[in-house]
A protein has these predicted regions:
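Short, acidic, small-residue-rich periplasmic hinge/interaction motif at the N-terminus
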Residues: 29, 43-45, 80-82, 98-140, ...
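Short, acidic Ser/Thr/Gly-rich low-complexity loop/linker segments typical of extracellular
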Residues: 48-64
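Short acidic/polar hinge/loop motifs at secondary-structure boundaries
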Residues: 68, 146, 179-207
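N-terminal periplasmic accessory domains that precede
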Residues: 99-104, 146-147, 188-190, 205, ...
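Transmembrane beta-barrel wall of Gram-negative outer-membrane proteins
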Residues: 242, 246-273, 288-334, 356-367, ...
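Outer membrane beta-barrel strand-and-loop segments of large Gram-negative receptors
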Residues: 293, 428, 437-441, 481-488, ...
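Face-selective signature of the C-terminal outer-membrane beta-barrel domain
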Residues: 306-328, 355-528, 556, 560, ...
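Surface-exposed extracellular loop regions of Gram-negative outer-membrane beta-barrel proteins
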Residues: 522-524, 559-604, 625-645, 767-783
Length: 831
């Protein structure tokens, strides 16, 4: 009986005996100091396949480590750490433990220099389909926001409302970490204003994306990549910034990476106080006028949080979760004085408005990656986004009229014969905009062989916007009641389904890629008036389907020359505010509203790129042309004494241009990057009769326009002795025509200096050194000309202190030697 019990136990133990295992132990020391090194990454590699295994760990405070229960076999133990030269040890496990003893890691002076002396990193580099801008290399970026940071990117412009344009085209899509992340034209200006620049790793500009990416945005895509790194060990930074306007930033970032888990977290607080103002001059052909001038300071506080982790489940499976969110509060006021001599109109209108609002937003993402092999994988992600918050705005108007019944032959008397009549109007507007969306992506990649590559996938985006707005009016603050004709609740839904496939390859020096993307999307809108419910208002429906092909051809030529030609089809969809017929009364003399009949506009985009590199110099030439039909544009018309602005599909457009980038490195100390963008804009003539809100038929027309414009940006970085670096950025935009007028030219200069002291970094910068950032435009109508001038921000001086930490055991070499640029061609070119 006893033997019967022992026999099954022995049989059960056979598999365990067949898979005998042992522990691998060791200790890591710094070669220069002999001190133990903690949080050094220890990774196990299969010696036969040379593939990393899921088994890994990090050293303890005394430098020791243990890899437990390693099955019998031949392995390589890889020891890696920030700022150190990696080492590898061959190990064989056979029925027992193995101690590989002490490993002495030597400092990698070059790598340490890259980690700590951030001022010498390349600001800009080229990849096959995009330009990449490093934020840490931008000295003038310290203490700024994402919106301000975009102003320093070549060919990118941010106007006074925070709206972004690329190569003179405002139809640009903005992503965060490669996804839309709930950003819409309604909310992205506020969101970009609240993201601290210190949380951003890099900005990618993709002017002609392939079929793999969304076709949204005829100008291209700007991708903001937040900091997340997989360098072995733990490291982070703390940053504090103050500015001359009483604002400031505080932030903390932390990263941890081991063989099994990568994690990151960051938190930032931003406080801002900005000035702003406006000037308007409207002249009529009969000699009358309406003018205004005002100031509009604004303020805000916000908290930004991001965190995430990736679990390397096996050698072939990764599971990740990440997210970011923000809580913000803003407030401000505007004081505007209007004067007019238009017959029958008021002669003075004193307008005082106040505003405040909250921004609450979050992005949560779950991802899974499975690799069948290193060249064949699928990546699946699902993300949820929420942005919104209540806002409040009040308007007080003190209006003065000339009394038409005034008798100059009689004594002026306020009660019997007043020369002027006065009216007070009070308004309050409440809005609670909310946007919710889901993003689902599945991307399959198969490097079929050394020549051919296949990519295919699905992308779904499901969004809903709900923005109720109510307005109260009265002759005093006490008697205000709701204004039914100014109540609005706009509900907007947009569901997008997309399938794509691209096939490419490389045969010797020739590369090609061709792709096709199909998208179907359904738009559903409702605009509710006062007292109406959802069931009372029929839904406005639009169903769309379109195909978007792309073709990329590239040829590598001798002597580091590269040429590329590509074609894509893109579109610009109307966003919520452009479709909402509700009137915005924030300025009683300039009222804007949307057009629910607005249709998407489609573009065909062509680019020809050439790049030539030398050891210390580089030049890149990009010629492009974009044809757009049925383009969406703002149109303005005068009805009575009020200027109305709405949206309509008018005219066709051809944009063409050339972008020149020249990079020079002099005496190993001076980096000079110059970008010049020359573009021509042709708009066909158009005319139609417009039915105004008051029932008047107003003929509108636009002349054929052919305008040339250009912009230039120069970034100069100088590496000085004593770990000092200096940077200056100058920007100029020429005059540019619009559908009914023009935008005047403008220029600005930013400067900054940085000092590195060990793990500390001190930065002093000045944004808009000459206080010259202003937005000036002219609008022409049948019987009037209007000039507008607006500004915000102004000259701002910032001081920033930053402390970096990590598991590095020795001080870096502070010698600021430069490095020659990579001469490998267009594939990955540092600037």
């Amino acid at each position: 009986m006893k033997n019967k019990f022992i026999l099954p136990c022995c049989i059960a133990l056979l598999p365990l005996m067949a898979n005998a295992a042992g522990d691998i132990t060791g200790k890591v020391l710094n070669k220069g100091t002999g001190e133990p090194m903690d949080f050094v990454t220890i990774q196990l590699i299969n010696a036969k396949t040379n593939k990393p295994l899921s088994i890994g760990t990090a050293t303890q405070e005394d430098g020791s480590f243990i890899l437990p229960h390693v099955s019998d076999g031949e392995y390589i133990v890889k020891i890696s750490n920030i700022g150190s030269i990696d080492q590898e040890r061959p190990v064989t496990i056979h029925n027992g433990n193995v101690d590989i003893g002490e490993i002495h890691l030597a400092d990698d002076a070059k790598l340490l220099q890259e980690v700590v002396v951030e001022g010498i990193r390349s600001q800009m580099r080229f990849e096959l389909d995009r330009k990449i801008f490093s934020v840490d290399a931008n000295v003038t970026a310290a203490g700024t926001s994402a919106s301000e940071l975009l102003e320093s990117i070549p060919s990118v412009e941010v106007d006074q409302d925070g709206e972004v344009s690329l190569r003179g085209n405002s139809s640009v899509t903005i992503w965060i970490n490669g996804k839309e992340s709930g950003l819409t034209a309604d909310n992205r200006a506020q969101i970009l204003e609240q993201i601290p620049a210190e949380t951003i790793d890099r900005i990618e500009v993709i002017t002609n994306p392939s079929a793999k990416y969304s076709p949204e945005g005829t100008a291209g895509i700007i991708n903001i990549v937040l900091k997340k790194d997989r360098k072995a060990g733990y490291y982070g930074s703390a940053e504090l910034s103050v500015n001359s306007r009483g604002g400031g930033n505080a932030g903390f970032n932390f990263n941890y990476s081991s063989g099994k888990v990568d994690a990151f977290a960051g938190i930032g607080f931003r406080m801002r106080h900005n000035k702003g103002g406006s000037f308007m001059k409207r002249e009529f052909t009969d000699g009358s006028y309406t003018n205004s001038s005002g100031e509009s300071p604004n303020h805000g506080n916000n908290l930004f949080l991001r965190l995430g982790a990736t679990w390397h489940i096996t050698d072939f499976d990764d599971l990740s979760a990440s997210g970011f969110g923000m809580l913000g509060h803003r407030w401000g006021h505007s004081l505007t004085d209007y004067t007019s001599n238009v017959p029958g109109n008021w002669i003075r209108n004193y307008d005082y408005s106040r505003n405040r609002g909250d921004m609450r937003g979050a992005h949560a993402e779950l991802g899974y990656t499975h690799k069948w092999t290193e060249s064949r994988l699928i990546d699946i992600t699902a993300a949820y986004n929420h942005w919104g918050g209540p806002s409040w705005r009040s308007y007080e108007q003190d209006i003065t009229y000339e009394n038409p019944a005034f008798d100059p032959s009689l004594p002026e008397n306020d009660s019997d014969n007043p020369r002027y009549l006065f009216e007070d109007i009070y308004q309050e507007q409440n809005m609670d905009m909310g946007t919710n969306s889901w993003e689902v992506k599945a991307d399959y990649t198969n490097q079929i062989n050394e020549i051919f590559k296949l990519e295919a996938g699905y992308n779904g985006n499901f969004s809903k916007e709900d923005s109720p707005t109510e307005t109260y009016m009265g002759t005093s603050k006490e008697d205000m009641t709701i204004a039914p004709n100014l109540f609005n609740r706009f509900i907007y839904r947009n569901n997008i389904h997309a399938l794509y496939a691209t096939f490419g390859g490389k045969i010797k020096s020739f590369s090609f890629s061709a792709g096709l993307r199909s998208e179907s999307w359904q738009v559903r809108t409702r605009s509710l008036s006062y007292g109406e419910t959802i069931s009372d208002v029929p839904v406005f429906k639009k169903n769309n389907f379109a195909l978007f092909p792309s073709v990329f051809l590239s040829l590598s030529l001798p002597y580091d020359n590269e040429m590329q030609i590509n074609y894509t089809r893109r579109l610009r969809r109307p966003w919520g505010g452009q479709l909402n017929s509700f009137r915005d009364i924030s300025d009683p003399t300039n009222i804007s509203y949307g057009n629910p009949e607005l249709q998407p506009q489609y573009s065909n985009s062509f680019e020809l790129n050439y790049i030539k590199s030398w050891t210390w110099h580089m030049i890149s030439l990009s010629a492009y042309m974009r044809t757009t039909s049925n383009m969406m544009n703002r149109i303005s018309y005068l009805d009575g004494d009020v200027m109305y602005t709405t949206w309509a599909n008018v005219a066709d457009e051809i944009n063409s241009g050339c972008e020149i980038v020249v990079k020079n490195n002099f005496i190993n100390r001076i980096d000079l990057t110059t970008t010049v963008n020359l573009y021509n804009n042709h708009i066909s003539a158009w005319d139609f009769d417009f039915l105004s809100e008051n029932g008047n038929v107003i003929p509108l027309s636009g002349r054929k326009q052919n305008s040339f414009a250009w912009d230039a940006r120069m970034m100069a970085s100088v590496r000085l002795p004593w770990s000092l670096s200096f940077q200056a950025t100058g920007n100029y935009n020429s005059k540019m025509l619009s559908a009914q007028g023009s935008r005047q030219g403008g220029w600005s200069v930013d400067i900054g200096v940085r000092k590195n002291i060990g793990n500390w970094s001190l930065s002093l910068n000045c944004r808009d050194l000459f206080d010259s950032r202003k937005f000036k435009s002219t609008t022409n109508g049948p019987d009037y000309t209007q000039y507008n001038e607006r500004w915000r921000g102004g000259r701002t001086i910032r001081f920033t202190v930053k402390y970096s930490f990590g598991n590095m055991k020795s001080k870096p070499n502070k010698k600021g030697d430069g490095e020659p640029m990579d001469g490998s061609g267009y594939g990955d070119m540092d600037m």
